[in-house]
């Protein structure tokens, strides 16, 4: 397969555009942390976040701010990471279906592997062979030679991979011994499947667990395997005997994370019950409750700078990562104060972590306001914030206020069609635009708070404007294709290039650091870049291959979509005593204000009726010709009422708002008119 290889199939697949509203530098994990890797040589900890970001931290306790850098290229949860090549290279697996290869020291992505067709959930690493395996929900296991991956370049971008077949269900855990002779997978099939990665031959299938196998470890020579399952048990397997040789019932709920010491004599376990235990594999009755976290445990990483390990790092569904000391654990065992009596449990060895890498808040709730432009959010700290989807920014932090009250406070009797969707999976606002409804929302410039240079009040398409802002730096959007030939002539004659089409949309810009993502509707990412980087040569070329035609139409060809039309019927109200008209079906822009319909009634229906009943003098005709539009508007409001469902309508309402809030029925909208009683 080819790293960075993207087939030019944008015309055949359904491509969506997404962007993330966020700060330029996101220093803190904004969601749970799925994986950890420790580099003891450089005193660095790598965290793989559900916010899609891999962060590097200093574990030097004397450093006031532990944050070093962020590694950003994924677009969904990062599920697993492994450090290779003595800490020089990091491999990551993500729910965006990719495996990425990083320069761990400099923090940049070197290549992207796209062989998986679904979430990549687990990685395994054979240190002696520099071999990495990846697996996920597509039931596939791929083997990668790390030295080959790190040698990839723009011209040499092809890498071969071996695959292990035979899994019948989604894979959630993977392990490979250091020597690279055995690989084991765990899945929702509730069995362990074992292969020889050198030949890709299936060796065995081990049965015993009754639920998903979430964690796996192998000893150095690949003769023993530890497994943790959602069934709440830890099992020790002999691969030589092809059977389970011990079962440890330590936890009250599912076991999601395991670590083991070098000698493979003590297992550290954590999971849904938030407790972390150390269990003696030779004597299962000897187990020590090390600590209790505040959230379910997702991953652990032993500090192996000494033997026995002096500490363990723990990641949970919360955004902070804790380091717990293990220094007193041996005295604890020697004294006999271990937890072998469930009816009279011993308190944990540690009540406070030794070190905390503080996390940030995650957005857990949102409400799109009626104007379909602003969003209210609530985070894990109960703070409420107000956001502008169009400008891709936070407008205001409202603090710890009542979320529902804020929604009520900002309610407006206005209807704008849905034109985007919101996802909170990463703990940040991800906005997605889809061809099916992206151009559904038209508003007037005045209502949107924008002024036009000529003082007019044009109708603006929100989705169209936003796409133009997101791709403002892409050179292809700067020159209308019709003017390219003429522009080249100007360039040749005058020595300068003339931009005939302004950059962006002329009304607003989005923050240049905004991540823009092109992906298939099923969730598979095609290309991610920062808004400001679309002017780069490589990025521009990839945009040419990736941007779908429906986006090209708006951003490059400047073809704005047509207005939405709404059909309706106009009839005299029953109280007016007027004869019911022939039921003609009318049609108008759904943004047409009620006052314009009132003017139509006054001018075309009421005036015509009056003229047919009286003989008009030439003076009256002359006066009628001089009557201004403004006068008609004033007279219409003075003399005419428009009703829907017997409710008098506000002249400032538009037809779509009337249909949504007042008509509320199937079929075409019906409006009634009557003259106001004098």
Swiss-Prot record:
Membrane-spanning ranges: none
Short name of one Pfam family: DUF3337
Residue ranges, annotated region (Disordered): 608-629
InterPro entries registered for this protein in UniProt: G-protein_beta_WD-40_rep, WD40/YVTN_repeat-like_dom_sf, WD40_repeat_CS, WD40_repeat_dom_sf, WD40_rpt, WDR48, WDR48/Bun107
Compositionally biased region (Low complexity): 610-621
Keywords: Cytoplasm, DNA damage, DNA repair, DNA-binding, Endosome, Lysosome, Nucleus, Repeat, Ubl conjugation pathway, WD repeat
GO cellular component, as recorded: late endosome; lysosome; nucleus
Main location: nucleus
Domain of life: Eukaryota
Gene Ontology molecular function terms on file: deubiquitinase activator activity; DNA binding; double-stranded DNA binding; single-stranded DNA binding; ubiquitin binding
Residue stretches of each WD repeat: 28-67, 73-112, 115-154, 166-205, 208-247, 250-289, 292-334, 358-452
Location(s) in or outside the cell: Nucleus; Cytoplasm; Lysosome; Late endosome
Gene Ontology terms describing biological process: DNA damage response; double-strand break repair via homologous recombination; embryonic organ development; homeostasis of number of cells; multicellular organism growth; positive regulation of double-strand break repair via homologous recombination; positive regulation of epithelial cell proliferation; positive regulation of receptor signaling pathway via JAK-STAT
Family affiliation: Belongs to the WD repeat WDR48 family.
Function: Regulator of deubiquitinating complexes, which acts as a strong activator of USP1, USP12 and USP46. Enhances the USP1-mediated deubiquitination of FANCD2; USP1 being almost inactive by itself. Activates deubiquitination by increasing the catalytic turnover without increasing the affinity of deubiquitinating enzymes for the substrate. Also activates deubiquitinating activity of complexes containing USP12. Docks at the distal end of the USP12 fingers domain and induces a cascade of structural changes leading to the activation of the enzyme.
Domains (record comment): The WD repeats are required for the interaction with deubiquitinating enzymes USP1, USP12 and USP46.
PANTHER family: WD REPEAT-CONTAINING PROTEIN 48 (PTHR19862:SF14)
The protein's name: WD repeat-containing protein 48
Taxonomic classification: Eukaryota, Metazoa, Chordata, Craniata, Vertebrata
């Amino acid at each position: 397969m080819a790293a960075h290889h993207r087939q030019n199939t944008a015309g055949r697949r359904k491509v969506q555009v997404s962007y993330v509203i966020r700060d330029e530098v996101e220093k803190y994990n904004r969601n749970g942390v799925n994986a950890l890797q420790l580099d003891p040589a450089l005193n660095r900890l790598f965290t793989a976040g559900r916010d899609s970001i891999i962060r590097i931290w200093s574990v030097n306790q004397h450093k006031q701010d532990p944050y070093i850098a962020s590694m950003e290229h994924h677009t969904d949860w990062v599920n697993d990471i492994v450090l290779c090549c003595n800490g020089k290279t990091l491999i990551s697996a993500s729910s965006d279906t990719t495996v990425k290869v990083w320069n761990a020291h400099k923090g940049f992505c070197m290549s992207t592997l796209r062989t998986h067709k679904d979430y990549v959930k687990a990685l395994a690493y054979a240190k002696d062979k520099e071999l990495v395996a990846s697996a996920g929900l597509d039931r596939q296991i791929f083997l990668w030679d790390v030295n080959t991956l790190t040698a990839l370049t723009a011209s040499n971008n092809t890498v071969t991979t071996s695959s292990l077949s035979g899994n019948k269900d989604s894979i959630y855990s993977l392990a490979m011994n250091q020597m690279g002779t055995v690989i084991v997978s765990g899945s929702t099939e509730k069995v362990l499947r074992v292969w020889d990665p050198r030949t890709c031959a299936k060796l065995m299938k081990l049965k015993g667990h009754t639920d998903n196998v979430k964690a796996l470890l192998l000893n150095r020579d690949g003769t023993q395997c530890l497994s943790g399952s959602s069934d709440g048990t830890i099992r020790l397997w002999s691969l030589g005997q092809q059977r389970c040789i011990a079962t440890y019932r330590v936890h009250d709920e599912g076991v999601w994370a395991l670590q083991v010491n070098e000698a493979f004599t003590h297992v550290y376990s954590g999971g849904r019950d938030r407790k972390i235990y150390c269990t003696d594999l030779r004597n299962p009755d000897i187990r020590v409750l090390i600590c209790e976290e505040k959230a379910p445990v997702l991953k652990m990483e032993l500090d192996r700078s000494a033997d026995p390990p002096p500490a363990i790092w723990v990641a949970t569904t919360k955004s902070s990562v804790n380091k717990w000391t293990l220094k007193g654990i041996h005295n604890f065992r020697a004294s006999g104060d271990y937890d072998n009596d469930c009816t009279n449990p011993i308190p944990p060895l540690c009540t406070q972590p030794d070190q905390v890498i503080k996390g940030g808040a995650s957005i857990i709730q949102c409400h799109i306001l009626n104007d379909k432009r602003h969003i209210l959010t609530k985070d894990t700290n109960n703070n409420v914030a107000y956001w502008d989807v169009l400008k891709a920014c936070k407008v205001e932090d409202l603090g710890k206020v009542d979320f529902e009250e804020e929604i009520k406070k900002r309610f407006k009797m206005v209807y704008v069609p849905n034109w985007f969707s919101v996802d909170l999976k990463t703990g940040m606002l991800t906005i997605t635009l889809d061809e099916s409804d992206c151009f559904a929302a038209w508003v007037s410039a005045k209502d949107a708070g924008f002024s036009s240079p000529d003082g007019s009040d044009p109708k603006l398409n929100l989705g169209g404007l936003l796409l133009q802002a997101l791709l403002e730096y892409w050179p292809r959007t700067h020159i209308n294709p019709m003017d390219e030939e003429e522009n080249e002539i100007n360039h040749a004659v005058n020595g300068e290039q003339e931009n005939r089409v302004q950059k962006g949309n002329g009304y607003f810009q989005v923050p240049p650091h905004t991540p823009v993502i092109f992906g298939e509707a099923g969730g598979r990412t095609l290309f991610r870049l920062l808004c400001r980087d679309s002017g780069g040569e490589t990025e521009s070329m990839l945009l040419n291959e990736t941007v779908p035609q429906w986006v090209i139409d708006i951003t490059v060809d400047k073809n704005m979509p047509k207005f939405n039309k709404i059909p309706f019927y106009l009839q005299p109200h029953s109280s007016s005593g007027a004869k019911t008209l022939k039921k003609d079906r009318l049609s108008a822009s759904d943004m047409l204000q009620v006052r314009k319909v009132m003017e139509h009634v006054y001018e075309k229906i009421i005036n015509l009726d009056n003229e047919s009943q009286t003989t008009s003098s030439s003076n009256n005709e002359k006066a009628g010709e001089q009557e201004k539009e403004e006068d008609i508007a004033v007279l219409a409001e003075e003399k005419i009422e428009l009703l829907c469902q017997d409710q008098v309508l506000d002249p400032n309402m538009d037809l779509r708002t009337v249909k949504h809030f007042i008509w509320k029925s199937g079929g075409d909208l019906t409006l009634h008119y009557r003259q106001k009683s004098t």
